[in-house]
Amino acid sequence: THLRQIYFAALDRETGEAGGEKILVDKLPLNLVQAGPIHRIFPDAKFVLSLRHPCDVCLSCFMQDFAITSAMANFFSVEDAATLYARAMDLWRHYASVLPLEYHEVRYEDLVSETEPVVRALLEFLGVDWHDAVMDHSSQARRPELINTPSYHQVAEPIYQRSRLRWPNYGDQLAGALEILASDIDRFGYSDGS
């Protein structure tokens, strides 16, 4: 389609590379609310739904120093972050129920505790061959031109568990968010405390 051609032309200009076999990963989490239009423009697109305890997601967003945009303005309070999370997940579930989206779920908690099997399953879904170097992601992450994220320093570190289930330390501050997120906590299998 015309929009697809425009997108790839802009990508070629931005990266300085043209054509060839590439795998493009757009990791902006809020793109899940664009799953419908993305599927329409790129019907063969594969989606990776990165899950994490909803309270940890909201706490992490609240604690980040994001550049202010209309979306990031929702992270000034954990309740607003929780509302955005719940609405975004509602829209994702709607798209997933009415469109033939090809997607794979990855739980952060599983990724940090059982990295290799989780990564192998993800690569299989993406149709990417396994290479042992995959387990040394931090060597690639040390190339800052490849990563543009507020958490660059974390991406360059080995996989760690210190952010897993951090939210209970802030239970009082997250009380309002817990109410908003209750159905997502249950729906994604986090109601058992994991």
Predicted regions and their residues:
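Short N-terminal helix/helix-N-cap motif within the alpha/beta-hydrolase-1
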Residues: 33-36, 59, 116
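Conserved phosphate-donor/acceptor-positioning beta-strand/loop module used by diverse small-molecule
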Residues: 38-62
